[in-house]
């Protein structure tokens, strides 16, 4: 059985999609709005921890 060029092309595209997908996810995490929400959540956590007598 001889593999066709079309099958080889699809296999190469599939491998490239797998290789480059983590880079796309990393860019999505660098959103300014998401960072602002994360900072707000941390400051609320720190206030609650300080109110309950936790470490500063």
From Swiss-Prot:
Keyword NADP included in the entry's annotation: no
One GO cellular component term noted in the UniProt record for this chain: extracellular region
Residues in the signal sequence: 1-26
Propeptide: 27-40
Record GO terms (molecular function): toxin activity
Keyword entries, A-Z: Amidation, Disulfide bond, Secreted, Signal, Toxin
Highest taxon in the source lineage: Eukaryota
Name of the protein described by the UniProt record: U4-myrmicitoxin-Tb1a
Organism of origin: Tetramorium bicarinatum (Tramp ant)
């Amino acid at each position: 059985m001889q593999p066709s060029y079309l099958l080889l092309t699809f296999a190469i595209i599939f491998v490239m999609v797998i290789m480059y997908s983590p880079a796309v996810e990393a860019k999505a995490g660098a959103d300014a709005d998401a960072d602002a929400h994360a900072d707000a959540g941390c400051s609320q956590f720190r206030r609650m921890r300080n109110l309950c007598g936790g470490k500063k």
